[in-house]
């Protein structure tokens, strides 16, 4: 799969050819996770509506839920104003985090609301 050249031209990638992907739950607005994508992962996501990311540690693409069953059905993809981050709005099935938690941001609260 190849990325539309018009979209590819707008992306700003790091030295490894990657850009950040923030994944948000449709309906609740909760941020579920942050991962990396390359052009091919974004192209696959846009074509299949299955969230596909790039693993820096394994050096390969992975489809969310392919092994765990914790899938992400993509409803929309937005590019930020700088072109270096995409926002995926998804329906999450199961946990988004590799720990099994619904979101990767349940672990530690560093600063809470003013009381």
UniProtKB/Swiss-Prot annotation:
Residues holding Mg(2+): 80, 82, 84
Reactions catalysed, as given in the entry: 1-(5-phospho-beta-D-ribosyl)-5'-AMP + H2O = 1-(5-phospho-beta-D-ribosyl)-5-[(5-phospho-beta-D-ribosylamino)methylideneamino]imidazole-4-carboxamide
Coiled-coil ranges (or none): none
First-tier enzyme category under EC: hydrolase
Documented EC number(s): 3.5.4.19
A cellular component term, taken from the record's GO annotations: cytoplasm
UniProt: Zn(2+) binding residues: 81, 97, 104
Cofactor(s) the protein needs: Mg(2+); Zn(2+)
GO molecular function, one term: magnesium ion binding
Keywords, in A-Z order: Amino-acid biosynthesis, Cytoplasm, Histidine biosynthesis, Hydrolase, Magnesium, Metal-binding, Zinc
UniProt subcellular location: Cytoplasm
Main location: cytoplasm
Keyword Magnesium: yes
InterPro entries: PRA-CH (IPR026660), PRib_AMP_CycHydrolase_dom (IPR002496), PRib_AMP_CycHydrolase_sf (IPR038019)
GO terms (BP aspect): L-histidine biosynthetic process
SUPFAM superfamilies assigned to the protein according to its UniProt record, in alphabetical order: HisI-like
Subunit structure: Homodimer.
HAMAP family reported for this sequence: HisI
NCBIfam families (alphabetical): PRK00051.1
Entry similarity comment: Belongs to the PRA-CH family.
Function as written in the Swiss-Prot or TrEMBL entry: Catalyzes the hydrolysis of the adenine ring of phosphoribosyl-AMP.
Protein name, as recorded: Phosphoribosyl-AMP cyclohydrolase
Originating organism: Mycolicibacterium smegmatis (strain ATCC 700084 / mc(2)155)
Name of the gene encoding the protein in the UniProt record: hisI
